[in-house]
UniProtKB/Swiss-Prot annotation:
Name of the protein in its database record: UPF0235 protein PFL_5841
GO CC annotations on file: cytoplasm
HAMAP family according to UniProt: UPF0235 (MF_00634)
Transmembrane segments: none
Family: Belongs to the UPF0235 family.
UniProt-listed PANTHER family: UPF0235 PROTEIN C15ORF40
Originating species: Pseudomonas fluorescens (strain ATCC BAA-477 / NRRL B-23932 / Pf-5)
Gene3D superfamilies: YggU-like
Matching InterPro entries: DUF167, YggU-like_sf
Length: 97
């Protein structure tokens, strides 16, 4: 099992979120999930909104192309990225052949 899968041109990421971190960054793997540290607190959807903006910037797409599939109130999240323009340097992440 991998932390990502392709659904056509869309990328689905399984993430483990660490809110209230000292910086916004990808932090390797946490089990079968991509660990992401964010400075935003987990209050009133702030961490979710910050996650969408962080991923949009990292993958070179507008925020409107990032959607939360599951995990709205949980650290374990599944996110859909519609047609990412670029792929950050993440463990094993590659476009399908």
């Amino acid at each position: 099992m991998s932390y990502y899968r392709w659904d056509g041109d869309d990328l689905i990421l399984d993430c483990h979120l660490q809110p209230k971190a000292s910086s916004d960054e990808f932090a390797g793997l946490h089990g079968e999930r991509l660990k992401i540290r964010l400075t935003a607190p987990p209050v009133e959807g702030k961490a979710n909104a910050h996650l969408m903006a962080f991923l949009a910037k990292a993958f070179g797409i507008p925020k409107s192309n990032v959607s939360l599939v599951s995990g709205e109130l949980n650290r374990q999240k599944r996110v859909r990225l519609q047609a990412p323009k670029k792929l950050p340097d993440l463990p094993g992440l590659a476009r399908p052949a």
